[in-house]
Amino acid sequence: MSAMGAGPDHLFNLRNNFYLGAYQTAINNSEIANLSPENAVERDCLVFRSYIALGSYQLVISEIDESAATPLQAVKLLAMYLSTPQNKESTISSLKEWLADSTIGNNDTLRLIAGIIFMHEEDYNETLKHTHAGGTMDLYALNVQIFIKMHRAEYAEKQLRVMQQIDEDHTLTQLASAWLNLAVGGSKIQEAYLIFEDFSEKYPMTCLILNGKAVCCMQMGNFDEAETLLLEALNKDAKDPETLANLVVCSLHVGKSSSRHLSQLKLSHPEHILVKRVSSAEDNFERAVQLVA
Amino acid sequence: MLTKFETKSNRVKGLSFHPKRPWILASLHSGVIQLWDYRMGTLIDRFDEHEGPVRGVHFHNSQPLFVSGGDDYKIKVWNYKNHRCLFTLLGHLDYIRTVQFHHEYPWIVSASDDQTIRIWNWQSRTCVSVLTGHNHYVMCASFHPKEDLVVSASLDQTVRVWDIGALRKKTVSPADDIMRLTQMNSDLFGGVDAIVKYVLEGHDRGVNWAAFHPTLPLIVSGADDRQVKLWRMNETKAWEVDTLRGHMNNVSSVMFHAKQDIIVSNSEDKSIRVWDATKRTGLQTFRREHDRFWILAVHPEMNLLAAGHDSGMIVFKLERERPAFALSGDSLFYAKDRFLRYYEYSTQRDSQVIPIRRPGTPSLNQSPRTLSYSPTENAVLICSDLDGGSYELYIIPKDSVGRSDVVQDAKRGTGGSAVFIARNRFAVLEKSTSQVLVKNLKNEVVKKSPLPIPTDAIFYAGTGNLLCRSEDKVVIFDLQQRLVLGELQTPFVRYVVWSSDMESVALLSKHTIIIASKKLVLQCTLHETIRVKSGAWDDNGVFIYTTLNHIKYCLPNGDSGIIRTLDVPIYITKVSGNTIFCLDRDGKNKAITINATEYIFKLSLLRKRYDHVMSMIKNSQLCGQAMIAYLQQKGFPEVALHFVEDERIRFNLALESGNISVAVASATQINEKDHWYRLGVEALRQGNSGIVEFAYQQTKNFERLSFLYLITGNLDKLSKLMKIAEVKNNVMGQFHNALYLGDVKERVKILENAGHLPLAYITASVHGLNDIAERLATELGDNVPSLPEGKTPSLLMPPTPIMCGGDWPLLRVMKGIFEGGLESADRGGTVDEEDVEGDWGEELDINVDGMENRDIEDILAAAEAGEEENDEEGGWGLEDLVLPPELDTPKASANARSSVFVTPPQGMPVSQSWSQKSSLAAEQAAAGSFDTAMRLLHRQLGIKNFTPLKSMFLDLFNGSHSYLRAFSSCPVVPLAIERGWSESSSPNVRSPPALVYDFSQLDEKLKSGYKATTTGKFTEALRLFLSILHTIPLVVVETRREVDEVKELIVIVKEYVLGLQMELKRREMKDDPVRQQELAAYFTHCNLQTPHLRLALLSAMGVCYKAKNLATASNFARRLLETSPVDSQAKMARQVVQAAERNMTDETKLNYDFRNPFVVCGSTYVPIYRGQKDVSCPYCTARFVPNQEGNICTVCDLAVIGADASGLLCSPSQVR
């Protein structure tokens, strides 16, 4: 998005806040004067995506009406998908319909949202069909994550390289390279840590940054520091699912009880991957006992 | 060339630096000698006694003297302190070209157009030697700095070196009579004390200058043949070494540089040239438009040169002396000579890091100008003026003690300045286009960004921000947002110093210091008359800086002051408490301890930290007029009061601060009318009428006093005053008082006594005092005045006071905040000072005051903040975003997407690789392959009951991944946590999973298990030991040795589990004493820690003794004694033994034969004696009677008794 243009980048702070997980700050500081129509749409997208990230799906659904621009409609679709998982079939079918429409099918935001939704469906084939061409930093970053999820670091790296060519210092580029560094592990983890460290120096601390640092620490075997960071994150947001999940993991490693954090996570985010893993593991255990016996 | 000072005058023919002070003498063609302070730029003195041009001038190196010689054939010796010529040496017969003092002897050497060189003794004021030999004008003559030599240059085209050893001997040992005789002879004939040693021929024209090298046997000369020649000499001969060509006209003067290996010459071709003395090549040339150069001078100590020309002179340096440095936390990186060096503040350790220049490369003006350091990457950017501005990027190797002298191949580039803006990004200024290039550590351009103003230098301004400098302003520019964050008009900024919290910045110009916030909001400006050199922030937010000759401070409000003076300029690098760390011009690190009391005191005042102020007043010797003046000026007279002894000043301060009691005390001491009066005025203002009265009494100011009594209603005193007035015969005063008192009779009486009978009569009659009026009328006789007609007289009576005396409600003076602060500080600080008069009401007020102030500040701050925000918002809407072209491009590529792209198959998750690779159960469990893990455990340890292991399995699995929230609203990315990470682990190579259990945790558990056992909490202990036993199958250790330890641990724990199980069982069997005894006995045969064994023995002994099985009991007792128990236990054991000796029998038969070694069956708790058949648990090694085979082991509750097993596998080292 932001190549070597001249002129100030009005949406910079908003975008940054959104990427770094300072969603409320992003929403609060979204009143920016003198935006061009395109920028205004992008601004609205970012604001509504922030609301989605905060879980305010209904607000997004009711705020975006029929007349809104395509990107906003796409965002609304995401809100609908996430708010009512039971209706996801219809959401997906209308998504597919839009994607097939040649007039709007190529819209970057629509493709991005499609990517996110299909990723939730774990249909990577479908996801990549829409996102692989990239085009915006968001799409490239999404691709990086998809390939990481698919355990194809080499593909992720290619996407990252494209991002670096566009703007190496872009927040998303930095974030994506941190993700990739964490995924490939080894000495790269240190670089990931430094990236999060840079963020924490430059911008206000968010749960996302703290969790990023904590994950790096855990990967480096430094669970004590990770615990401190996670507790700091917990202070900021006592219900942040990643903070809770990572705290569970971290507590296990430092030999403390993790059950409280786990029950909290189960209560507030029953759909979280850790919760799912825990319950599947229990079944798995019973099955294995049967199998071995 | 860096010009430090310039004068405009007549042609300058002679120059001399003062060896210590910043002074220079310039002798002019007009006959005047000027004395300048080149640092301050002021003319100190002028000496005007020569007639005609003065060509030679020289300072004495220790006395306050200088010598001059001119075209009037006179050599004059002057005392510059007395501003006068001491005496004149006469003898030369023509113009005098140069004069010079000897560095040691009281000699002067002079060269003259009369073809001679003369040496004079300025103490005896005589000529001691005449050196003849030149056959044309001698243009210059000078002593060798160490040896007994003189070098001279003459228009006869030669340079001559003279040996004056004989002259020196004569001076050194004048007492030697025989010598003196011969010397007198030689004096008569002349020329014997000074003989020509060498005649240097080689110049084709007249030689204008010749000079010795300060240390080496070298001479340099310059002549009208436009050449500079270098000569070398030894004991016996001298020869020409080389010729330096380049000057286009007569060379006027040439000399060696005092410190560097260079030669400097100047010429009538209007240029100064700098030559490399070793390579004999020209290094630099400085030209002037119109002025021919005539003379050159080198400072003997410092790096300074001076040159005289047709219209004045210049004092200059050849290169900067400020070492380039960069600060990073506790360490300082700086460039010295050709090395990058590192200094650690805490240890004051100084070491060489890497060489940055090859040895022998020319150094003039190529030394680093600025340095920028990135701590995380350990990279250094060095900028220099080379090639019109360039930078070099060095990565310091990790083992940076690098003694090696190999110069790294640095990454280079050109650019005005280069500075790190993030860990691995630096910005390079491209002056021509006014844009910055952001580069990465590979020196590749990452981004280009145009700058908002024409910039000639960039500085760091926080991550991602740059401070751009132009001629008259600086701006802070955010490179990512491309926004100007702040802008400030400034003089030309040379250095930028950020406070450690990056909240404030100091911008140093030549004569100005500007302190601003991080958004460049001006906080204060300081002007200095002398150059500002460097500065650093101290921990309290005070800016400490140096000028050429002072260390000074600047408080946040702009107050500044001197901390101490400096002899030589220094460059502050860091301030830490009372210590200033600095670099000097030789690039040495120094720590200077300063007295910070003054500025800390002022800072505390400023910040309203009155407790600090108070304690500082109490503890330190702060005083002096300056401090009092400061306090007064800043509105803290009450603080100043604490410092002052002098009563008058005290009185003034007390009045100013409204402290009446102190003022009264002082006034009493002073006891002067004026002071009493002023005290009265102040007391009146405050409403303290008691003091007012006192003051008026002291000054005997009755009128004021009576008026005071009137308005305070103090009628008693008023009437007293009236009496006093009567006594003093003060009629007017008496009358006034009577009037004030409304005493008509008295008034009539006074008027009568004063002889104003008609007035008295009228007064009496008007007031109806008829008898008096009649009496007066008779006295007046005919002259009875007529009463005014038609007017109704009214009674003039002052109102009766309702109440009288006492003070009025006192005005609350500005005593306010501070006194309160002081007093409360007193109370807080020293408990025993209870005599402080606490006036609670007042204090309350004071607090309110304080609050108000703070509130106001808050409001102000808030208002400011608000403004800032507004500003920011204003900044947004400048222009519409130009949409980057990229927005259009994806459409083309997106169209092609579905056709070409093939989704790659999914890769292998890390956990899968774990389960593929590992044969360790724990790792399989972490990978989620529970069945494989169980199979492994079954095979290795015969484990069949997995239920106790369930939570371990789950924990291992749950702890194997962390969760990364990546893209917003997307599923999170689980990341496999690997074991044994190190900085050098290579990426993409998978290590085994990090496990939540490790051996050290088990050790902890074992200890707490022991503890629980000792305290008798057997259930708890059993739980702990069992959990150890259950965890061990899922523990992974690294080394073989640890494997052995794990195996040992199993056995140890098993013994305890078995023992504790038996003990718990025993407690259940209250009704079966035999079984109880047996179990107690078996317990003592478990392998326990000695203290536990003792307890087991004790309990077994007790049980048996009670059951009257004395023999068995005594056996336990004996075993107990063998463990050397504590006294009480030993005593009991001995008693048991004694009791048993009398009766060595057992009441009941036990299944227990202690003579026969046995193990205890883990489930039936019966002894299995040696030789009997048994089966064992493949995991915990517990033994069982044969019929237990196939059951689950009751000790570990995991494995099948008697099952086949390959053995515990708990380390990758076992697999290898």
UniProtKB/Swiss-Prot annotation, chain A:
Disulfide partners: none
The entry's keywords: Cytoplasm, Cytoplasmic vesicle, ER-Golgi transport, Golgi apparatus, Membrane, Protein transport, Transport
Topological category with respect to the lipid bilayer: Peripheral membrane protein
GO molecular function terms listed in the Swiss-Prot or TrEMBL record: structural molecule activity
A GO-annotated cellular component: COPI-coated vesicle membrane
Main location, first listed in the record: cytoplasm
Cellular location(s): Cytoplasm; Golgi apparatus membrane; Cytoplasmic vesicle, COPI-coated vesicle membrane
Single GO biological process annotation from the record: protein transport
Family: Belongs to the COPE family.
Function: The coatomer is a cytosolic protein complex that binds to dilysine motifs and reversibly associates with Golgi non-clathrin-coated vesicles, which further mediate biosynthetic protein transport from the ER, via the Golgi up to the trans Golgi network. The coatomer complex is required for budding from Golgi membranes, and is essential for the retrograde Golgi-to-ER transport of dilysine-tagged proteins.
Quaternary structure (record): Oligomeric complex that consists of at least the alpha, beta, beta', gamma, delta, epsilon and zeta subunits.
Name the UniProt record assigns to this protein: Coatomer subunit epsilon-2
Organism, as annotated: Arabidopsis thaliana
Swiss-Prot record, chain B:
WD repeat copies, ranges: 7-48, 49-88, 91-132, 133-172, 202-241, 246-285, 288-326, 363-404
BP term (GO), one: endoplasmic reticulum to Golgi vesicle-mediated transport
SMART domains in UniProt: WD40
Lipid bilayer topology: Peripheral membrane protein
Keywords: Cytoplasm, Cytoplasmic vesicle, ER-Golgi transport, Golgi apparatus, Membrane, Protein transport, Repeat, Transport, WD repeat
Taxonomy, superkingdom: Eukaryota
GO CC annotation terms, alphabetical: COPI vesicle coat; Golgi membrane; nucleus; plasma membrane
Gene3D superfamilies: 1.25.40.470, YVTN repeat-like/Quinoprotein amine dehydrogenase
The UniProt record lists the keyword Repeat: yes
UniProt subcellular location: Cytoplasm; Golgi apparatus membrane; Cytoplasmic vesicle, COPI-coated vesicle membrane
GO MF annotation: an example: structural molecule activity
Signal peptide residues on this chain, from the entry's feature table: none
Record text on subunit structure and interactions: Oligomeric complex that consists of at least the alpha, beta, beta', gamma, delta, epsilon and zeta subunits.
Function: The coatomer is a cytosolic protein complex that binds to dilysine motifs and reversibly associates with Golgi non-clathrin-coated vesicles, which further mediate biosynthetic protein transport from the ER, via the Golgi up to the trans Golgi network. Coatomer complex is required for budding from Golgi membranes, and is essential for the retrograde Golgi-to-ER transport of dilysine-tagged proteins.
Protein name from the UniProt record: Coatomer subunit alpha-1
